Amino acid sequence: RPRFCELPAETGLCKARIRSFHYNRAAQQCLEFIYGGCGGNANRFKTIDECHRTCVG
């Protein structure tokens, strides 16, 4: 799994409300969060399937 999968979810600095998914290391699964639209980190996916393919395996 890529190292960025270990990063915490970051909503970013903007105020949009974009449904996104991130890999939660403690829970060992992909979870939904709301992304603000700018900033953040690479542990952010448009779909839960994309998150699973990248971070779960």
UniProtKB/Swiss-Prot annotation:
It is found in: Secreted. Its main location: secreted. The keyword Glycosyltransferase does not apply. Expressed by the venom gland. SMART domains: KU. The keyword Transport does not apply. GO terms for cellular component: extracellular space. GO terms for molecular function: serine-type endopeptidase inhibitor activity. It comes from the Eukaryota. Serine protease inhibitor. Belongs to the venom Kunitz-type family. This is Kunitz-type serine protease inhibitor 2. It comes from Naja nivea.
